[in-house]
């Protein structure tokens, strides 16, 4: 089977749907015409296929919003949301909005959970607002009130949730001269996807306008402020750039003093049950779970199933995907039978996996090898659910390996301090890799992903546990031992005395999603490399694998560049295992893989 990126790419923009999406553009008065801007805005319509609106909300400030309604299903909840002089666009879900309204003694004017952001901001300001929100979000808020103290006629705040679960990109275009006569003010933009800015960005480069143009990830856990100064040139300027308002978890100086194991187990259960329950009860749309049969997705599915049984008699929908004979199908079926879910096995061919790669790269806006491999199955399962189910809210098990140190290479971690450091590094960068995949592969099909393992309170508690207890390598235990033990039959059974999961699932060794979709004897990475390698690399020899790996990377990068030229900086580095000699990101290539799988 031949892969022709140039043949496939021309069909993707018309066939790819992209959950809610936001778009904003500052200081665009002379550079781009409204018709052109609207065309770029509409490239993101798939994230919110149910409603779209582009609106001028302030002088030289344009807001755009695409909506997929999860809560507040009436038209009054459409965005931009406006209360007096404050206007908001937000891609997110605020899980504690009802509690916040009760605390403020405020009756909302719409059913949108995002409206609470405006009320919090008006009463308490931006920093306290961000501390109070429990949810996932990327938002742009404009305050049109004149601020005499700071001499401004408008202030805008842009913010993103602590782990970047909702995507957000920042566009910066600066020019010394425009038409060689008029000074062109700097243009700023914020959007949920690169594709809404790509053509605008390329036009600056192509026409050699200016000396500063970039598209970058807006950092999680930060906010920025833009203002118009009354006494100077009336343009929007960045006055505070990505100011940190939260850190991913507690610092090492705030570890728990009480290390009583039974108390820790109880707290782990309490925080994680809460993380899932809030995500179940705040959805007004049907729910489904992605179920690979691994520990993480199985834990999430089991607890979602437990809460759904309190709400409805209709069995929870679960989905697994893989090639014929894949490891994930086998274990997912065990979990589904144990829990009594309405399970669907999606069996795909090698050709179906391979042929969709260009679509995947266009959707996820990345060329990182690990991310692309893992995204193929994610993208196809999202596509299947969107075409065959009424479910709109899709639970996943992503984030656990970063938080709990679940990757197999962590067995080579030298000590518990390094273990803690590596977990925090993985969480800090997760928006560039796994979270990017888990959001875009699902939202690209008009669905909303929910990721309870990255719940703010849960993450902060888990990281507050002393590393000696979290670090399985120190105690020569299987990966994520503390998490597994916390939900084992020893510590948790339901009202009928039944464990949450069978032991064969609870203690199943970590298998990457991109590996688990295939057989042990024929891994997905090797299938891809067969298709993407050049003929002259298919020779016997010690360097054959490295050549095939390079060709795979080149194919992904070339495909990415065909959609998003001059944007290679959007990923900071290639994701790779650490603490060991690795030429591939697949755990199946590591020297100790078979040892762990047979343990």
Show the residue positions of the predicted features.
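Cysteine-centered catalytic environments shared across enzyme families
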Residues: 16-366, 392
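ATP-dependent adenylate-handling active sites, centered on carboxylate activation for C-N bond formation
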Residues: 10-18, 26-32, 145-148, 155-157, ...
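Conserved S-adenosyl-L-methionine
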Residues: 502-508
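Short, solvent-exposed coil/turn linker segments
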Residues: 193, 243, 466-468, 502
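Short alpha-helical linear motifs
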Residues: 81, 108, 485-486, 535
């Amino acid at each position: 089977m031949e892969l022709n990126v140039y043949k496939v790419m021309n069909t993707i923009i018309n066939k790819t749907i992209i959950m809610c999406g936001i778009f904003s553009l500052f200081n665009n008065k002379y550079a781009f015409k409204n018709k052109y801007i609207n065309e770029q805005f509409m490239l993101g319509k798939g994230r919110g296929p149910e409603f779209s609106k582009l609106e001028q909300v302030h002088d030289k400030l344009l807001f755009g919003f695409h909506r997929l309604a999860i809560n507040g299903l009436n038209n009054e909840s459409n965005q931009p949301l406006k209360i007096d002089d404050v206007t908001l666009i937000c891609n997110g879900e605020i899980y504690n909005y009802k509690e916040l309204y009760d605390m403020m003694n405020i009756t909302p004017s719409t059913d949108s959970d995002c409206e609470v952001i405006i009320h919090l901001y008006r009463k308490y300001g931006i920093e306290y607002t961000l501390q109070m929100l429990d949810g996932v979000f990327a938002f742009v808020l404009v305050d049109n009130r004149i601020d005499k103290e700071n001499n401004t006629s408008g202030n805008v705040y842009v913010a993103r949730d602590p782990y970047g679960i909702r995507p957000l990109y920042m566009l910066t275009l600066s020019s010394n001269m425009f038409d060689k006569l008029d000074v062109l003010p700097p243009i700023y933009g914020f959007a949920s996807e690169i594709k809404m800015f790509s053509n605008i960005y390329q036009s600056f480069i192509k026409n050699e306008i200016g000396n500063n143009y970039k598209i970058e990830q807006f950092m999680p856990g930060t906010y920025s402020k833009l203002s118009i100064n009354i006494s100077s040139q009336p343009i929007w300027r960045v006055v505070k750039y990505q100011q940190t308002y939260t850190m991913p978890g507690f610092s090492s100086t705030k570890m728990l003093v009480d290390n009583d194991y039974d108390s820790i187990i109880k707290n782990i259960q309490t925080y994680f049950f809460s993380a899932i329950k809030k995500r179940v009860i705040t959805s007004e749309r049907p729910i489904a779970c992605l179920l690979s049969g691994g520990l993480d997705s199985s834990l999430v599915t089991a607890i979602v199933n437990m809460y759904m049984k309190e709400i409805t008699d209709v069995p929870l929908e679960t989905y697994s995907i893989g090639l014929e004979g894949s490891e994930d199908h086998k274990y997912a079926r065990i979990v589904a039978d144990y829990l009594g879910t309405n399970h669907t096995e999606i069996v795909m061919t090698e050709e179906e996996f391979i042929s969709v790669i260009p679509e995947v790269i266009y959707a996820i806006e990345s060329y990182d090898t690990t991310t692309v491999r893992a995204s193929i199955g994610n993208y196809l399962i999202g596509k299947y659910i969107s075409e065959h189910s009424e479910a709109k809210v899709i639970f996943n098990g992503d984030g656990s390996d970063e938080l709990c140190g679940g990757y197999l290479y962590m067995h080579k971690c030298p000590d518990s301090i390094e273990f803690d450091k590596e977990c925090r590094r993985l969480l800090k960068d997760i928006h560039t890799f796994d979270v990017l995949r888990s959001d875009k592969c699902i939202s690209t099909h008009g669905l909303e992903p929910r990721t309870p393992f990255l719940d703010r309170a849960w993450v902060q508690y888990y990281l507050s546990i002393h590393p000696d207890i979290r670090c399985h390598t120190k105690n020569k235990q299987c990966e994520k031992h503390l998490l597994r033990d916390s939900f084992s039959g020893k510590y948790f059974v339901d009202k009928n005395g039944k464990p949450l999961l069978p032991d064969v699932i609870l203690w199943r060794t970590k298998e990457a999603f991109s590996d688990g979709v295939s057989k042990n004897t024929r891994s997905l990475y090797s299938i891809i490399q067969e298709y993407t390698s050049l003929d002259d690399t298919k020779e016997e020899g010690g360097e054959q694998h490295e050549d095939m790996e390079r060709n795979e990377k080149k194919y992904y990068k070339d495909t990415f560049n065909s959609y998003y030229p001059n944007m290679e900086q959007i990923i900071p580095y290639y994701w790779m295992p650490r603490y060991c000699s690795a030429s591939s990101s697949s755990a199946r290539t590591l020297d100790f893989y078979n040892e762990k799988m047979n343990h």
